[in-house]
């Protein structure tokens, strides 16, 4: 498995991320079958505006760019939300990406492992995430890494 290092995202990287993330999230929502692409685009824009009112500087949100520790090449990114709950400091991964051409080469696992290390260093007691039902590769990775299902949404088409 490759090793990665996480570096706080720069403003330039954040702006590049945001230039594609709204549409990517909308596509994920629409492909899950929960709403039309038009409605998903509206939901995506509203969600990003609500979650990131101050962009990269939004309180309790952290963005990291992942680099291959050996080559220095950029391999992906992760966006994590921090929240204090009754059990202590928790984290939720809002977005996790591996560059498309590098998928299935161990970088997903490496980014998740590096993220867990950073979160432990910061005193985080648990981390959660969402995965769309049709993303079988990600679901498999998360299960292999010890994530447990905490809720499931299901639907059945009637027409």
PLM segments and residue spans:
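Conserved acetyl-CoA-binding loop-helix of GNAT-fold acetyltransferases
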Residues: 95-98, 104-121, 140-144
């Amino acid at each position: 498995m490759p090793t990665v290092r996480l570096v706080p995202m720069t403003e330039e990287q954040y702006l590049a991320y945001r230039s594609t993330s709204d549409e990517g999230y909308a596509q994920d929502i629409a492909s899950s079958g929960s709403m039309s692409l038009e409605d998903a685009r509206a939901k995506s824009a509203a969600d990003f505006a609500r979650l990131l009112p101050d962009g990269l500087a939004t309180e309790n949100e952290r963005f990291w760019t992942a680099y291959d520790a050996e080559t220095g090449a950029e391999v992906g990114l992760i966006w994590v939300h921090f929240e204090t709950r009754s059990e202590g400091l928790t984290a939720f991964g809002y977005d996790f990406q591996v560059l498309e051409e590098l998928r299935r080469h161990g970088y997903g696992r490496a980014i998740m492992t590096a993220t867990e290390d950073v979160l432990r260093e910061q005193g985080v007691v648990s981390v959660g995430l969402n995965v769309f039902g049709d993303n079988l590769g990600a679901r498999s990775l998360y299960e292999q890494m010890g994530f447990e299902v905490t809720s499931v949404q299901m639907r059945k088409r009637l027409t």
